[in-house]
């Protein structure tokens, strides 16, 4: 006689109505801590740690952030962008020999392949936001190079693709901008460093050393900054095993959102609207009365001053000019107005406020503010892509269903 196997009924999860408490949990009765038991995170994943990283950290309560243990602000003051790029990829700062070898490695990677260059005019003509043509061009570039899924590559091959994406980004951004203006692209100069090359390719004239240095400090200060939206997007895509180009394209898409990458030009627009110090109260109180955000103030991580803003304020002072003086007046008065209205929050300038001033003083057009940010942040994206691929587990969270109860009978007609 055949013995029947006893089947234990599946325990159904208990789903309570969506609570007002964002940290409320979804539990499975009788299976405490069982694999797959959901943990409900707050909206936006604020404060949620999803992985370990050795790339850097943001300590908001201290007003401090670093790249691989070195203060990012100190790096911006003392090291060129290429050294910081090397640091994020290799894990240590280069010595003189490593610096020369790295420069020799990345210099030829700045040139746009002929098959990609041939299509850039059409991409530029297609229009869209400043990052839209770049997103398309990066996708084309990755296909042109034959980038394969990260899961199929060894570490050296992944590094090769990541280097290529970082090196080509400033060239593509400036070429697309110039083509959109009806101008010919300017090839990178092998004798110029990254920041100088960026301004050279943007304008077609040799940049003033002071401008190149100011832009370099900005670029170094924005290479990486924790698990922001675009970096997290890049890691999610990398976790699927997709190619590095696909991960960067996704990150660009995230950066194109105004809540992430669109504030530098908007902060500068505020300065233009104010015009003179005597109009600060009138303009700002109007925006506050309308319930609008004052662009360039406040940060989701920093509870006081953004260290990047502090550094860029000094860079702006070094550049000088009436606009810088106005910015300092606006910074001081807006902080007072915000303190009066929101005494429980210490809203101070974030990186975007003085970033716009610095870039404008260095001749970077406003439509290129966010692309300029992308030209350095791509290094952080790629460092995170490499780190994700080195110890990968696909990022696959869950969602809580809050629609009508299921299953429902399918109606017939």
Task: Please place each PLM-identified region on the residue numbering.
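Hydrophobic alpha-helical bundle cores within soluble ligand-binding/oligomerization subdomains
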Residues: 2-6, 10-413
